[in-house]
Each structure stands twice: as C-alpha cells, then as structure tokens.
Amino acid sequence: MKLKAMYSFLSDDLAAVEEELERAVQSEYGPLGEAALHLLQAGGKRIRPVFVLLAARFGQYDLERMKHVAVALELIHMASLVHDDVIDDADLRRGRPTIKAKWSNRFAMYTGDYLFARSLERMAELGNPRAHQVLAKTIVEVCRGEIEQIKDKYRFDQPLRTYLRRIRRKTALLIAASCQLGALAAGAPEPIVKRLYWFGHYVGMSFQITDDILDFTGTEEQLGKPAGSDLLQGNVTLPVLYALSDERVKAAIAAVGPETDVAEMAAVISAIKRTDAIERSYALSDRYLDKALHLLDGLPMNEARGLLRDLALYIGKRDY
C-alpha cells in the first residue's frame, strides 16, 4: 500500500497537526522561525506524528491533546536533522539547502536547540509529568546518539553492536516514543502502551537499516542528496560493516577518509554493492520488522492496528 493511501484515514488530523507545526516553529526572533519554517516546508513523511495518532486510537482519542504530542515528536526529529546536517557538513536536505548551508553552522545548532525547547514546551501542554519525562529522556538519548555518530566517524573497526546502539538512540527510540506517548496520552491500558513502545522500537530499527541501505541503492533524485552520502561523510552503516567481512573490498573501504574524493568514493560504493552486504542488511531489517509485526497480534483489533501493520511493512520494504 502506498503511503498516501495509508494516510487517507488520518488526512484531516494530519492537516491539523501540520498547521500546529507551523505555529510551533514561529519565533519572536524572526530568523529562528524563518530557519525552522525553511526545514518544515521541505516536507517529509511525518512518520512520527502518524504513529502518535494511530497509537492514540487504542485509548480515548482526543485530537486537541494528540496534536501536542504529534508536534512535540516531529520537532525532536526536525532538531536532530538540523544537528545531523552540521555534523555531516551536508548542503542538501530533501533536495533543498540545509539550514547550515543557507545560514551557518552556529545558526543551525541554535535552531536545533530551539526546536528541542519548543518540543518540551508543547508536551507540557498535556499536564502529564510522565509523558514529559519520557519526552525529555528521548531527547537525551537522541543527543547521545548524535555524539556517538561524531565519535564513530571513519571507525571501520567498530563492532555491529556499536552501530545497533547508535541507530537505536538516533532513530528507533524516537519512533518507540511516538507510539508510547500517543497511547499514554490517550489513556490506553499499560500493557498496550508497553506493546506499542516495543513495536515502535523494532519498526525504528528496521526503518534506519532500510534508510542506510537506500543510501547505496537509491538515486540522488529519490534521496534528495547524493547517493553514498553517508560513507562520504564518514558514517559507518550496516552495509559497510557487512562489506568489511569481504576481503576483496576490506582494504578499499578501510582506506576511506576525509580526503577521499567523489570519484574514489564512487568506486568503493560500487565495490560494496557487488558484495552480499545489501542482502544481509535487508535480512536483519526483516528480522526487526517480523518482531514488530508479531507484537501487533496482541493488540485489540481495530482499523489503527491494520494501518500500523501497513505502515510497518511500508517502512521496512520501501525502495526510496
């Protein structure tokens, strides 16, 4: 099922969330709001708000409350993108100039911080201390993941568990929190809240692994940035780690560094694609996806459950 068809069930609610996002990024200091709006208008799948809204269907659904949760989670995601672009020295995001490219590195960092603060402000509207604590802890873990990404650049000897821990913090926990907080804010029973949290966690792991695969298999037009950007920026992802076990390409990959030019990198990327690294990466993504789908079987049967399944399958099987 296409993403647009999946979203049709929530189209009016997502439109309301989008309007709330525009209000949330506004600032009395014009340039901050302008930069945040620049990123917001670049678009995106709004995966996290969708998970919030669907998870809330397992409790007492109240759009006015859910808007605050959905906006808070999307703002964290936006903040992490702004910071990532600084870390990776990226000039394009979704086919548009990044904030750091259009303004500056320093301005981008403060814009990211501003979005984190706005996120906490939005969640405070719920008046739910536990939800606020979950959100704050999620921000802490996202920041830890960002620091780990900096430390792990060009570290081709890192074990698989280091990569998995990093993507858990940078990606999976935010999707897990989206599911958890949607259900929590709707007053869903605790066993359902926990089940949705772990569903989101496993979907998030599959999501990031698939994203890392697409960096090698997608086109610049599909990705909104040059293919192979992760490796070019020193980010050691799952396909790279698996390819390092192939002696034919190990030396070439290990030689990659900040001075490697685009032509040399293109040759390394082609070599990686000739190994079984992509297939092995998809296999691990599928394992996480299977765990997520199994958890859905224990949820009450409703339309949201079916859409969560469709969304999980889309995330794990998408080709761009």
UniProtKB/Swiss-Prot annotation:
The keyword Flavoprotein does not apply. It catalyses: 4 isopentenyl diphosphate + (2E,6E)-farnesyl diphosphate = all-trans-heptaprenyl diphosphate + 4 diphosphate. Binds 2 Mg(2+) ions per subunit. The keyword Ligase does not apply. Mg(2+) 2 binds at D84, D88. Keywords: Isoprene biosynthesis, Magnesium, Metal-binding, Transferase. Its cofactor is Mg(2+). Pfam families: polyprenyl_synt. Its EC number is 2.5.1.30. Supplies heptaprenyl diphosphate, the precursor for the side chain of the isoprenoid quinone menaquinone-7 (MQ-7). This is Heptaprenyl diphosphate synthase component 2. It comes from Geobacillus stearothermophilus (Bacillus stearothermophilus). The lineage of its organism: Bacteria, Bacillati, Bacillota, Bacilli, Bacillales. The gene is hepT.
